[in-house]
Amino acid sequence: MSMQDPIADMLTRIRNGQAANKVAVTMPSSKLKVAIANVLKEEGFIEDFKIEGGTKPVLELVLKYFQGNAVVESIQRISRPGLRIYKKKDELPKVMAGLGIAVVSTSKGVMTDRAARQAGLGGEIICYVA
């Protein structure tokens, strides 16, 4: 059976892994998932990630905790296959008044809402992370 929304699956694996205090979570890899993982690492929401190759590459995310609590308080899918959400550069949302991030897919790649605003780019709002 094929997966309908692989990005939602990725976010759910992160959410469930942190709820169960797992060190790392694994999932099938794709270019978009790697780009999202890179943004999460740059923003300090995950420790690290690596791709274990082969014919079916696997993405492993090393989860991050602070004083025993998960760093990711909430992670929420916004644009989904049945309802895509696009925003212009001046309409990009501020998550938790700037404390969280919105992951945005732009014409220049996947980046945070802050980076997209600085670059003057709009795009598809993939998810909110706080």
From Swiss-Prot:
Give yes or no: UniProt keyword rRNA-binding. Answer: yes
Which Gene Ontology molecular function entries are recorded, alphabetically? rRNA binding; structural constituent of ribosome
Under the heading Pfam families, the entry gives:
Ribosomal_S8
Would you say which domain of life the source belongs to? Bacteria
Q: Which GO terms describe its cellular component?
A: ribonucleoprotein complex; ribosome
- Entry keyword set: Ribonucleoprotein, Ribosomal protein, RNA-binding, rRNA-binding
N-terminal signal peptide: none
Q: Which InterPro entries match?
A: Ribosomal_uS8 (IPR000630), Ribosomal_uS8_CS (IPR047863), Ribosomal_uS8_sf (IPR035987)
- Family affiliation: Belongs to the universal ribosomal protein uS8 family.
Q: How does it assemble?
A: Part of the 30S ribosomal subunit. Contacts proteins S5 and S12.
Q: Name the PANTHER family for this protein.
A: 40S RIBOSOMAL PROTEIN S15A
Q: What is this protein called?
A: Small ribosomal subunit protein uS8
Q: Source gene? A: rpsH
